[in-house]
C-alpha cells in the first residue's frame, strides 16, 4: 500500500473521521457524538473527556491532526482568531507571527474587515502586522456577501481531506 509508518497511517484515518464530523453535521455519527460528548459547543471546541470513550478520544486526536494542516477560508471573519488560527496562505507558518496587540488578544479576523465595503481595513492591517503579513492578508480575497468562515485542506486541489494527503502531510511534518 505504500505506507511505511502504521501509526501515522492510523492518524490520517482518524483525521478522516474528524473531517466527516466537521463537514457532515446531519450525519448520524455527528448527531450521536454531539449529544454525548459536545452538547454545548461545536466539534472544534470539544474537549477531551476523562470518561470519554476510546473512539471519541481517538477522533479528537484526528481533529488535532486536521488542525495542524487545515487552513481557514475567510468569509465574515467571525470564527477565525487573528493570532491563534491558521488562516494565512503560506506553507510553513500559516499563523500570524506579528506581536499580539494586548487589547486584541482574543480578536477575530472580522475586526480587520470594513463592514460597509467588505474589504480589508488597510489602515488597521498596516499598523498591526509585519510587511510580509500585510501582503499575505491583502492577497486573501473576501466574499462580497457575508459568508461563513470555513476550514479547508490545502494540500490537494479539491480542498477536501483524504487520508492519503493527510499521511503525506504527517510525513512532511516529521
What are these regions (language model features)?
Residues 1-174:
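A helix-boundary/hinge signal
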Amino acid at each position: 500500500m505504500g505506507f511505511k509508518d502504521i501509526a501515522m497511517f492510523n492518524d490520517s484515518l482518524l483525521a478522516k473521521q474528524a473531517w466527516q464530523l466537521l463537514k457532515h453535521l446531519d450525519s448520524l455519527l455527528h448527531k450521536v457524538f454531539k449529544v454525548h460528548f459536545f452538547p454545548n459547543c461545536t466539534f472544534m471546541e470539544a474537549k477531551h473527556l476523562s470518561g470519554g470513550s476510546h473512539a471519541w478520544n481517538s477522533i479528537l486526536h484526528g481533529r488535532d491532526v486536521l488542525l495542524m494542516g487545515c487552513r481557514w477560508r475567510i468569509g465574515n471573519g467571525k470564527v477565525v482568531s487573528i493570532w491563534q488560527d491558521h488562516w494565512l496562505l503560506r506553507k510553513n507558518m500559516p499563523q500570524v507571527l506579528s506581536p499580539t496587540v494586548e487589547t486584541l488578544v482574543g480578536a477575530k479576523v472580522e475586526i480587520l474587515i470594513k463592514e460597509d465595503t467588505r474589504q480589508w481595513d488597510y489602515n488597521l492591517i498596516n499598523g498591526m502586522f509585519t510587511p510580509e503579513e500585510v501582503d499575505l492578508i491583502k492577497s486573501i480575497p473576501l466574499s462580497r456577501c457575508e459568508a461563513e468562515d470555513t476550514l479547508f485542506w490545502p494540500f490537494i486541489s479539491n480542498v477536501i481531506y483524504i487520508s492519503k494527503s493527510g499521511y503525506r502531510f504527517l510525513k512532511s511534518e516529521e
